[in-house]
Amino acid sequence: MPRRGASPTPSEGEIDIFGSLYPGETDNANGGNGGDDFDFDGLLNNPEPGNDDTDEAFIALQQAASFRKATNLKGRTVKKGGGFQAMGLNNNLLKAITRKGFSVPTPIQRKAIPLILDRKDLVGMARTGSGKTAAFVIPMIEKLRAHSARFGTRALIMSPSRELAIQTLKVVKEFSRGTDLKCVLLVGGDSLEEQFGYMAANPDIVIATPGRFLHLKVEMSLDLSSIKYVVFDEADRLFEMGFAAQLTEILHALPPSRQSLLFSATLPASLVEFARAGLQDPSLVRLDAEQKVSPDLESAFFAVKGAEKEGSLLHILHDVIKMPVGSPEGVNNDSEKGSKKRKRGADGGSGKPTEHSTIIFTATKHHVEYLANLLIYAGFAVSYVYGSLDQTARRIQVEDFRMGKTNILVVTDVAARGIDIPVLANVINFDFPPQPKVFVHRVGRTARAGQRGWSYSLVRDTDAPYLIDLQLFLGKKLVVGQETKNPSFSEDVVVGALKRDPVEGHVEWFNKSLHESEDINALRGVAVKAEKLYLRTRNSAASQSAKRSKELVGSQGWTQLHPLFGEDVDGAEQARVDMLARISGFRPQETIFEIGGRRDKGTTEAAEVMKQLRKRITPRRQTEAKADDDFEGIGDDIPAAAEAGADSDEEEVVMDEMDVDEESDDGLEVTVTNTNSKKGRTDWRDSEVFMSYTPRTFNAAEERGYGVSSGGQDPSNFVEAARGVTMDLTNDENAKSFGEPTRSKMRWDKKSRKYVSRENDEDGSKGAKMIRGESGVKIAASFQSGRFDKWKRANRLGKLPHVGEQVRPGSASHAANLPSGVRYKHKQERAPKEADKYRDDFEVRKKRVDEAREKRVGRFRDGMGSKKELKGREDIRKARIEKEKKRLKNARPTRRK
């Protein structure tokens, strides 16, 4: 029996001399140094027993061999300490990791993989592109090892979007190469009957979106007690209100002994918002918390007007990114060179986007359709994706962009999370994100794996409060216009205007295209209506950010040329821009009721009313302005982050704490206050013994941005605050989900003329038939439609095995098939043979032939059994004779006209 390999694998400096004690064994499987690799003849010929010099020479030779470079060892690699080899992974998995191109684990992988292998619940956060997917896939494959003969799924990976689930499936397939693990993908839009077969085939790993997985669980009455490994990818998105009902039902069915893992690029420090996940003594790994975006990312924020957004977008594409018009080079040539003998699917391509590849993020799907058609009309190669698009169309559009067939991908936030597109150069935020963490996920699509990338954001005047929220969240310096020479686009938030001449030219072309294309004009009208609804429903910015945004928009730097275009600014051009800014911001001193009152010296009744109203309003405004000036004079040195948080008591305590804490330098960037202004309030606090209820380095803007339920909302929102302080003691077991009150809320229904529960409006069941799930949450009644029973009868399958039961050959789960990457389907169409009148089934066969002739299948494809549709001379002659016989037989005269 071969000797078991050491676990963990010995590091570089360790010597294994036991290999020489067993000359009959080989260490190739265990990774040791075999005896055949080196020449020991001169050393070991007739060794004298008990000779210490021989032993020392042998050990010295072994050490010298182990310290050789990997290039000198043919077919071997030197195992380095601290790498994947030191984690105790099996050989197949190490080969898959090497084949993938990974040599050294990333920080999140180095921290998370050992904790996961120790069966600890984990909450992991690291910036985008840091290898979070591999951080939970590698230990999952290490723990599962091989396919289990007992029925039941053992690992579940939940993803918020279909594209992210497909990408996770590709990673799992690459790392599980060399094993017999079965992995399935369950997303919406695919055939439900095929997914019945996937789940009946006893898969080991299930990668699914919450909605479709819940549908299959209810329809098939799945038992999830065998699941031992659960991953919530992009957990902050999954635990938002959109997936509340699905996750509540799924979590209720999972066993309490499972291992739960939560991963995302934006997670709060407090785990209270993930209480529903059922974490047991979790470990929190937050890496790069102070650096939310990649250091290789350069960002530019352009101040634009609402009517010039389309022209500004075209200016960025043409003049800044220099996007070529038309299809990318080489696309047509590659398609013509494709061989018919060797076919490759979508997964078999190399996936090489062009150096101009750009993603444009918009607010709604109506904006996606509108911009996609506009850019196609402008001559660009465009793909588009949004949530309600057909699944097949989504895959085709994304693959076209991955393979470089298109240069632009217009999407909603459905593609903002987790989608890894190699060599993506640019990200454009056409609609500014309403939450800081959404911006982090959007720009995280570029500047990945050490590559450089750019992000461009269009900021209107109404988006300025969200820009300030983002600046506070990132903790970067705000640079407006030309106030700073040579600003850092990766370290600062640089805001400025675009060049007027190119923008005006593109705006004119856009207005012309609206008159020429009725489709674009109609789509623009729909997008405008959708934007109005979007603005009413998006999260509100912080109140202090809204106040500061007025000063920011009114400043001179808001309309100055962006530093991205250089410092050489024409004086006349700048004067023209300033004049246009003054005209656009002009506010008359008189109202319409007072026009002409000074020249005519006569006062009308309306002018007199406005005069009396102005007497009352003017002193009040002067008092408010004086109070604001006094406040600014007191705290001139207060940075923007402290001003934004000055309205909450928590942040005041934090700022006072920063006065007494001189050692925490990293927190000074975020919360600093003037000690002279609050000296009277802080005298009673002893810096040695005073203990605050918040951490010293607490950043309220950051935690508010990371929040799952709040997102970027104002903490003074009454609904959120009321939910936090509500305590109900009755019927607490019937609560829908965590943190929601259980008392019934009713509303008057005009149609039924009675009070009905408001829950129907909130959970989407209004006007739809709902049923209660096992956890008490309402789910759609269509989840129990009986389609699984019909599928079993159609496939002649009996009852599925119970969880833990041994799967025997010939059973239902053994007969079902799993997707194997390449699916072969019979696509040949052949017509049946002509019916033989001497057979018993002549009529049936004749009917089949007639159906094939009618559908033009096989040899009937070109017509009635002939190769051409036109009749020949003999066919026409025979048809005339037959027609004449019928006329004579009928013996009726023809009708006279």
Curated annotation (Swiss-Prot):
A motif (DEAD box) lies at residues 233-236. Residues 886-897 have a biased composition (Basic residues). One of its GO terms (biological process) is rRNA processing. GO terms for cellular component: cytosol; nucleolus. It is an enzyme of class 3 (hydrolase). InterPro entries: DBP10_C, DDX54/DBP10_DEAD-box_helicase, DEAD/DEAH_box_helicase_dom, DEAD_box_RNA_helicase, Helicase_ATP-bd, Helicase_C-like, P-loop_NTPase, RNA-helicase_DEAD-box_CS. It holds the Pfam family Helicase_C. Its main location: nucleus. Residues 756-766, 829-838, 851-885 have a biased composition (Basic and acidic residues). It catalyses: ATP + H2O = ADP + phosphate + H(+). Residues 113-285 form the Helicase ATP-binding domain. Keywords: ATP-binding, Helicase, Hydrolase, Nucleotide-binding, Nucleus, Ribosome biogenesis, RNA-binding, rRNA processing. ATP binds at A126, R127, T128, G129, S130, G131, K132, T133. GO terms for molecular function: ATP binding; ATP hydrolysis activity; RNA binding; RNA helicase activity. The keyword Glycosyltransferase does not apply. Its EC number is 3.6.4.13. The keyword Chaperone does not apply. The Q motif is unique to and characteristic of the DEAD box family of RNA helicases and controls ATP binding and hydrolysis. ATP-binding RNA helicase involved in the biogenesis of 60S ribosomal subunits and is required for the normal formation of 25S and 5.8S rRNAs. Belongs to the DEAD box helicase family. DDX54/DBP10 subfamily. This is ATP-dependent RNA helicase DBP10. The lineage of its organism: Eukaryota, Fungi, Dikarya, Ascomycota, Pezizomycotina.
